[in-house]
Amino acid sequence: MAKQHFYLKLNPPRASFTFDMTNDEKLVMQHHVSYWKPYVENGIVLVLGPVLDPKGGFGIAVIGVDDEMQLETLIANDPANGLNSYEIYPMKATSKFINSIS
């Protein structure tokens, strides 16, 4: 079965978040990075990281999953979910790691 691909945008609680996180928020974000690292290593996450927009940073990911339930589970278990909010967009993706447009 072909993977379904999604673009995720992680919106912080405030525009200045990237620059003025509290110690507790930094800890949550460290856990967030640790949570996603195995999914980067196993290829579920194709791209992951912060966008350093001076008007207000945010995070992005491009993810290939078997179904939307898998995506929902990944997001629900993210330690940063709740502190931050997700926008989710389906994609028609192709790359050298993907055999065809999905």
Named regions from a protein language model:
Residues 1-102:
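Conserved, structured core segments of small domains
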